[in-house]
From Swiss-Prot:
<feature type="region of interest" description="Disordered">
    <location>
        <begin position="172"/>
        <end position="210"/>
    </location>
</feature>
<feature type="zinc finger region" description="RING-type; atypical">
    <location>
        <begin position="120"/>
        <end position="162"/>
    </location>
</feature>
<dbReference type="GO" id="GO:0016567">
    <property type="term" value="P:protein ubiquitination"/>
</dbReference>
<feature type="compositionally biased region" description="Polar residues">
    <location>
        <begin position="198"/>
        <end position="210"/>
    </location>
</feature>
<dbReference type="InterPro" id="IPR001841">
    <property type="entry name" value="Znf_RING"/>
</dbReference>
<dbReference type="GO" id="GO:0008270">
    <property type="term" value="F:zinc ion binding"/>
</dbReference>
<keyword id="KW-0732">Signal</keyword>
<feature type="compositionally biased region" description="Basic and acidic residues">
    <location>
        <begin position="340"/>
        <end position="357"/>
    </location>
</feature>
<dbReference type="InterPro" id="IPR053238">
    <property type="entry name" value="RING-H2_zinc_finger"/>
</dbReference>
<comment type="pathway">
    <text>Protein modification; protein ubiquitination.</text>
</comment>
<feature type="transmembrane region" description="Helical">
    <location>
        <begin position="47"/>
        <end position="67"/>
    </location>
</feature>
<dbReference type="GO" id="GO:0016020">
    <property type="term" value="C:membrane"/>
</dbReference>
<feature type="signal peptide">
    <location>
        <begin position="1"/>
        <end position="31"/>
    </location>
</feature>
<feature type="region of interest" description="Disordered">
    <location>
        <begin position="327"/>
        <end position="357"/>
    </location>
</feature>
<keyword id="KW-1133">Transmembrane helix</keyword>
<keyword id="KW-0862">Zinc</keyword>
<dbReference type="InterPro" id="IPR013083">
    <property type="entry name" value="Znf_RING/FYVE/PHD"/>
</dbReference>
Length: 357
């Protein structure tokens, strides 16, 4: 650790040269006192010795103080950088953030349960129909996509309930699958008996007012996250919960039916798989671009196709459980893949040279 910086060394040099200059003036003062009275030589010598000792002590204390001051400054600067790096490391990876379903508010507005899910807890603005939202499956809280992406880039908890949204190493986003015979949703990760879900958790306030979070009509996707039962208050400066524990958090909770939840997760996987489509390759001319339109037009058409697929998939009719199966989701993925391939112009391998007769 470098202690002697340029400014600090200049300060120490000035502190050393000033007492030395005073030492040079001390003999002249003692000589003037000795010329006035020759009988006081002994007392003048004692006073000069005392003055030298005092100046030496003062110089020593000054040097020690300067050294300690420089060390404290270096430690504070180093500690500040360590705290900053530790806060940066607490964020969630971009891949995990993108695994949370994103959609437009107008696409799920007609399917939500209750009057909740109408406001973002980060910017405190109501949702508009054409605004992109991001839904948190562990706690069903919904935020603007830009707001929650910025929040999770430096934090790993939900802004409302402080649920841990970071996945452990080796875990993946829980993708529910449908059983053809029973029609029940099966999660990819088994829930342990000691895990507690957000459903039915209660909060007790200091003023003897009990607030119980509304019981969700759906089980949700709560397999890989641990949601605390009690919402402990934290200050806004620490970057944790922005909502007081006794406030009504229904307006931040978007409760959706199980079928809609499964469709959102499936369509989010489809959208992520079609972000970067492979290009057809020729052995003679290498990679080729899309055959229909330019790159920007292809991405625009693919996004429109995906949006139509989302709207179509969410416009389902609630039927008994045995009727629904995984065939609907597989057909949807196949149709969306074919539509995107057609819009992007990335067809299967074809001959680039005409056949010779």
């Amino acid at each position: 650790m470098t202690i002697f910086t340029r400014d600090f060394s200049h300060r120490i040099l000035a502190c050393v040269l000033l007492p030395l200059f005073l030492f040079q003036c001390l003999p002249y003062v003692t000589c003037q006192q000795g010329s006035e009275s020759a009988g006081r030589n002994g007392k003048s010598k004692e006073s000069s010795i005392i003055g030298i000792v005092l100046l030496s002590l003062f110089l020593l204390l000054l040097v020690v103080y300067c050294l300690n001051y420089g060390c404290c400054i270096e430690e504070n600067e180093t500690g500040g950088h360590e705290v900053l790096h530790s806060r940066v490391r607490r964020g969630i990876d971009k891949d995990v953030i993108e695994s949370f379903p994103a959609f437009l508010y107008s696409e799920v507005k007609a399917f939500k349960i209750g009057n909740g899910g109408v406001e973002c807890a980060i910017c405190l603005c109501e949702f508009e129909d054409e605004e992109p939202l991001r839904w948190m499956p562990p706690c069903s809280h919904t935020f603007h996509a830009n707001c929650i992406d910025e929040w999770l880039s430096s934090r790993s908890t939900c802004p409302v309930c402080r649920a841990n949204l970071s996945l452990k190493s080796g875990d993946s986003f829980p993708h529910p699958s449908m059983d053809v015979e029973t029609g029940n949703a099966q999660r990819g990760v088994q829930e342990s008996p000691d895990e507690r879900s957000l459903t039915g958790s209660s909060v007790t306030c200091n003023n003897n007012a009990n607030y119980t979070t509304p019981r969700s009509r759906s089980t949700g996707l709560l397999s890989s996250w641990h949601v605390p039962e009690l919402f402990l208050p934290r200050s806004h400066s620490t970057g944790h919960s922005l909502v007081q524990p006794c406030q009504n958090i229904d307006r931040f909770t978007l409760q959706l039916p199980e079928e809609v939840q499964r469709q959102l997760v499936s369509l989010n996987l489809i959208k992520r798989s079609h972000i970067a489509l492979p290009r057809a390759r020729s052995s003679r001319q290498g990679y080729r671009s899309g055959s229909v339109g330019n790159e920007r037009t292809g991405f625009s058409q693919g996004r429109q196709t995906l949006r139509r697929a989302i709207s179509t998939s969410l416009s389902f009719s609630f039927q008994p459980a045995p009727v629904r199966s995984t065939l609907d989701r597989d057909n949807l993925m196949r149709e969306t893949s074919q539509a995107n391939d057609k819009d992007f112009g990335e067809r299967s391998f074809q001959r680039l040279m005409p056949e010779k007769n």
